[in-house]
Amino acid sequence: MARIAGVDVPREKRIVISLTYIYGIGKQTAKEVLAEAGVSEDTRTRDLTEEELGKIREILDRIKVEGDLRREVNLNIKRLIEIGSYRGMRHRRGLPVRGQNTKNNARTRKGPSKTVAGKKK
């Protein structure tokens, strides 16, 4: 496995797919990085030369990925919680943040359902 931005990317896959294993790099960003580095998208990771890998690493060093990006996202969420915004309150309570309806769904965010005892007759 080639190591790029602190992540072991798969050797057998095409480089454009391998780069998406890095947190913060999607398909579009991977294509832009490869275009700037002058590497074909169809090249397998194992077929890259050290020079090409060096170019890709150099370009990715300028982009916020992995630990730096995760830290920034967590700090943004902490900031929302500290200032007491509506979004911060939703984060704190573990509810959907972006206005989704929670009457019936939102099980992923709310966790498994807790059964409430029904009213006795």
From Swiss-Prot:
Gene3D superfamilies: 1.10.8.50, 30s ribosomal protein s13, domain 2
Matching Pfam families: Ribosomal_S13
Keyword annotations of the record: Ribonucleoprotein, Ribosomal protein, RNA-binding, rRNA-binding, tRNA-binding
Cellular component, GO annotation: cytosol; small ribosomal subunit
GO MF annotation terms: rRNA binding; structural constituent of ribosome; tRNA binding
Cysteines joined through disulfide linkages: none
Superkingdom classification of source: Bacteria
InterPro entries for this protein: Rbsml_uS13_C (IPR027437), Ribosomal_uS13 (IPR001892), Ribosomal_uS13-like_H2TH (IPR010979), Ribosomal_uS13_bac-type (IPR019980), Ribosomal_uS13_CS (IPR018269)
Residue stretches of biased makeup (Basic residues): 106-121
GO biological process, one term: translation
Subunit organization: Part of the 30S ribosomal subunit. Forms a loose heterodimer with protein S19. Forms two bridges to the 50S subunit in the 70S ribosome.
Biological role: Located at the top of the head of the 30S subunit, it contacts several helices of the 16S rRNA. In the 70S ribosome it contacts the 23S rRNA (bridge B1a) and protein L5 of the 50S subunit (bridge B1b), connecting the 2 subunits; these bridges are implicated in subunit movement. Contacts the tRNAs in the A and P-sites.
Similarity section: Belongs to the universal ribosomal protein uS13 family.
Name this protein carries in UniProt: Small ribosomal subunit protein uS13
Annotated source species: Listeria monocytogenes serovar 1/2a (strain ATCC BAA-679 / EGD-e)
